[in-house]
């Protein structure tokens, strides 16, 4: 039996979004999280012997996304570096988009990674002098343990 107003049970905890934002900021500076699904955003002290943040797609059609606007500087090479992993009994689709254009698309699983962590590098230099909308998607592919684990997301300009 539930006591009190049913509406109160539907409201998210007041600081939940702030906690999610802090967890994402710790591993992906400048990024915000959208469309968070099962389990929310969970900061883990140790996953595969590394600190990590766990995400999950909102539903079968809506990926959980890490997003930010990025001014890509002229006269420098720019590189997006991602270190991510998968649930031991699942997999997920990693997509990297700039201005809604897919730059990288890969299944993250034991079969494709062959180790505990996937290292991805995406060259952003072609966007030099532009402000881009950058998105990293934890996209569902078969809806079995689609948890994404993020160790680090960095944008490097040299």
Predicted ranges, named:
Residues 2-158:
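Gly-Asp-aromatic-enriched flexible segments
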